[in-house]
């Protein structure tokens, strides 16, 4: 069933209600923090944010007698938005509750704009973005390419992961093979696995060990099933595909960090069907298409838009087959979605 479009007034009312709820939550949070800080708090120590729940986060202690234990913490009002993977300074209170007093610098961050166009961090301090897709729901090259642009922009290594490889059949194999061939030709690391049958999971584990990785992808591609296969003791909830839309249903509602016994961490993020890139520039998008790198700056005209201009190096490469039409379509679609001031 198609999603009903909201008019401007309905969107305004929704945003107003959400703003009022956020203000009430912030007031409760401020009161709770004041009460905690008015009592006995332990010394400052470092911690790792492993999950985020509204006005509270779960912090894993990294030092001292409580190292490895998890505490629910409030945030001081002057702190920036924290996400799973953030390293913080915090102080422990009573009954497993604490207060975060500072955020430590991030080595990397994966961001996307929210529904109001405000930049929202998704995960912090990750080494690898694992872009998960599957035969069902049908994979969209444009979404994969958006993740790749975000990865290149953030300086984070991407891994393309086709899950549910056991669902490949005569009907979907041609389109899937054509999709995979594009990324293999570009040199992106790509792995085919089946969390259900266990195929390829040892190779995936080897790639994840020793790294901080984040799973991203649309709902229904089996991210939670992958987590369950990699970490059987976790038992994350798995949801079916919607029988009406063929799209995935959300089972992960907040990004959560898990530890591997052999070293390394994994952040499982909620599934999304769109990934906005309104925070990047046209130049960032062009740099995110790695096959463009040797061609940029070689067009006849310095301000070439790579559309219909004569002497365009990208159009010539497209004509010669050095750039795939699917990738050019994604590039143009992403550019069309950027705000005017990104040009």
Curated annotation (Swiss-Prot):
Chain sites annotated for binding GTP: 163-166, 217-225
CC cofactor: Zn(2+)
UniProt xrefs under InterPro entries: G_CP_dom, NA-bd_OB-fold, P-loop_NTPase, Ribosome_biogen_GTPase_RsgA, RsgA_GTPase_dom
Annotated S-S bridges: none
Highest taxon listed in the record's lineage: Bacteria
Keyword Plastid: no
Class in the EC hierarchy, top level: hydrolase
Residues reported to bind Zn(2+): 299, 304, 306, 312
Family matches, as PROSITE patterns: ENGC_GTPASE, G_CP
Signal peptide limits: none
Cofactor note: Binds 1 zinc ion per subunit.
Keywords assigned by UniProt, alphabetized: Cytoplasm, GTP-binding, Hydrolase, Metal-binding, Nucleotide-binding, Ribosome biogenesis, RNA-binding, rRNA-binding, Zinc
General function of this protein: One of several proteins that assist in the late maturation steps of the functional core of the 30S ribosomal subunit. Helps release RbfA from mature subunits. May play a role in the assembly of ribosomal proteins into the subunit. Circularly permuted GTPase that catalyzes slow GTP hydrolysis, GTPase activity is stimulated by the 30S ribosomal subunit.
Quaternary structure and interacting proteins, as annotated: Monomer. Associates with 30S ribosomal subunit, binds 16S rRNA.
The family this protein is said to belong to: Belongs to the TRAFAC class YlqF/YawG GTPase family. RsgA subfamily.
Protein name listed in UniProt: Small ribosomal subunit biogenesis GTPase RsgA
Organism expressing this protein natively: Pseudomonas fluorescens (strain ATCC BAA-477 / NRRL B-23932 / Pf-5)
